[in-house]
Amino acid sequence: MSTKAVRSIELARELGVKPLEIVKFIEKIRNIQFKKGTTNIKVEPDEIDKIIQHFKKEAKLEKIKEKEEKPVELKKTEEIKELEEKKPITPKIIEEEIKEEEELQLPGRFRREISFEKIEKIKPKPVPTKIPPKKFEPKKWLDIKEQKKVKDKNKKEEPAVTPSTAPRKKSIKIEEGTTVKEFAELIGQKVPDVIKKFMELGYMPTINQPVDIDAAQLVAESFGIKVEFSQTQELDIIEEVEDSPELLQPRPPIVTVMGHVDHGKTSLLDAIRKTKVTEQEAGGITQHIGAYKVTLQGKDITFLDTPGHEAFTALRARGAKVTDIVVLVVAADDGVMPQTIEAINHAKAANVPIVVAVNKIDKPEANPQRVRTQLSDYGVIPEEWGGQNIFVDISAKKRIGIENLLEMIALQAEIMELKANPNKPARGTIIESRLDKGRGPVATVIVQNGTLRIGDAFVAGVTYGKVRAIIDDTGKRINEAPPSTPVEVVGFEEVPQAGDSFTVVEDERIARQIANTRAQKKRLAEMQKAQRLTLQDLYEKIKEGEVKELNLVIKGDVQGSVEALKKAVEDITHPEIKVKVIHTGVGGITESDVNLAATANAIIIGFNVRPETKAQDLAEQLGVDIKLYSIIYEVIDDVKKALQGMLEPEIKERVIGRAEVRAVFKISKIGTVAGCYVLNGTISRASDGVRVIRDNIVVYEGKISSLKRFKEDVREVQAGYECGITIENFNDIKEGDILENYVLEKVPVKGL
């Protein structure tokens, strides 16, 4: 067995096969699908032996086939020889006829006099009269092409068309999403010529970029062609077809857990799944939607955990759209709170039944009856009081009443008779999305109808793609996902918006066409909206007397958090200043974000992300303020305080140095030592802290416990030198991580 990983190209060279064959075989082993055209991938040691055995077997089979075929070939050749001997034609004449060079030199008339059937097949009669002899001289393959062209001309009786001549089309039809290349083919012009025309109009398109309809009309008119615009019938392509009752099969219920912050939603799911989800959340608050599948008494139930803070209204509204049953968690000691009322309104708006879980009944101050009374005021009435809502008293912490709650959920699902057709293309909803460095754009999808399979082409909002991998809630790769299954999908062209519909279509071409159409419609709507806002703002400014605006750029680690943060800050009101979010995005803070903030005089807010080194330097040069947070409450509080002029003297962080981890050493009794190279500034042991940054996302923040150079303890290490660093209570350091060393300084407040 091999102990070392190799590249697929090297292995293919050794086995004498094509690299693509190796890649296809690895796809079968790993149960995944690589991007089209991938030939050079890493082959693990345990896969090498399987590949060698597979291709050796194929080679043996080929040899056996060759042996079996050989005697048949010999018989055929003998038969041919016998036939040739029986022919009345003398061998000498046959040899002269087969020689191509001599035959080509003979005049046409003489060749016809001694021609036999074989010669007539090789050279048809019209050829000698039409083609001059000089065309036979350079290369014989050119003669064949020329002869074919002559034949086509004789058949069609049309003059030859050169590439430079103008097209005969007087009008063409183009659809939304037509690329520059497709447009050039339609009007019969070369792509570079068409791009030049677009550039003259002030557009700078690429070959695969969709054309602007107005610009395309002007370009076509310059070539004497009229353009007719035909809209893509998107609704016809992805229209929902009602399934006949015999095709429908029972599906698991999708249950959304809702409730006020700290009332125990995640703890309830934790009790069901017997895992420690709560401890992993920043500040004990759920930051992203989680989707889990639980099997109870042989039946599956899919749970969605929506964040409980009121800032996550948008997320919870999306959760209500995809759910079948809402479990409303209310703490027995706190009672009904603002977010509880909000959750009730979302569930009622979506016409979803509510099962109430009265949590924390183990506490001395718990009063479950008070909760029932309060909820009845909002139309959620217990069954025992003559209402339609099931109430269950539970304690998620002590696992009291959990089994009873699950039985009630299963009972509610049975009453609803939930069904779907698994034998059709999948449809679903994007629950969460993010940009993964290794896998590209990925999204959590709830499949609501049909079955999602690897290789399916799909549309999701204004983006599209092809399913390359499907990962279930346990992290396992699967081939297909039936209805009511939460999965992570890899294969998006761009990061989709959370809440977008996910629809499988016939092929990638249709998917791209629909996505481009939607993108163009969205772009036009935004342009019109921007124009309306400009006029309104102008009127408001005249009326209110130059109202100031606080412009913000928000970047986060996932789309859901960014949307929630945007809504939260935009809801903050102030009599003199308006809060306006001018840009949002997923991923680290880039130079583009800094330039935008500088132009709009905006502040950048980073939520669980870090700025790139170049972006940080540019921000310092341009004087752009970057604020970094990990908990949403802090962002809201800081913005409110800044608007009210109540900010306390600020303790500002100053980054004094950055180091790159180039090697990792594990030493007993000490832990993990990071072998680092100081990129810039100074790494100091006396600093206030150090951050471990992986792919522009903070994975840990703590203090340096030791700093060494050549086995000697040192106070600091300058840029350009190597050193060994250990971090307090953290051993999960990896090669390529960036260690950011900082100090805290008191800075006079200027306002946010």
Swiss-Prot record:
This is Translation initiation factor IF-2. PANTHER family: TR-TYPE G DOMAIN-CONTAINING PROTEIN, TRANSLATION INITIATION FACTOR IF-2-RELATED. Disulfide bonds: none annotated. Residues 250-419 form the tr-type G domain. InterPro entries: EF-G-like_DII (IPR053905), EFTu-like_2 (IPR004161), IF2_II (IPR044145), IF2_N (IPR006847), P-loop_NTPase (IPR027417), Small_GTP-bd (IPR005225), T_Tr_GTP-bd_dom (IPR000795), TF_IF2_bacterial-like (IPR000178). The keyword Protein biosynthesis applies. Residues 148-159 have a biased composition (Basic and acidic residues). One of the essential components for the initiation of protein synthesis. Protects formylmethionyl-tRNA from spontaneous hydrolysis and promotes its binding to the 30S ribosomal subunits. Also involved in the hydrolysis of GTP during the formation of the 70S ribosomal complex. Residues 284-288 are annotated as: G2. GO terms for biological process: translational initiation. GTP binds at residues 259-266, 305-309, 359-362. Keywords: Cytoplasm, GTP-binding, Initiation factor, Nucleotide-binding, Protein biosynthesis. Residues 148-170 are annotated as: Disordered. PROSITE patterns: G_TR_2 (PS51722), IF2 (PS01176). It is found in: Cytoplasm.
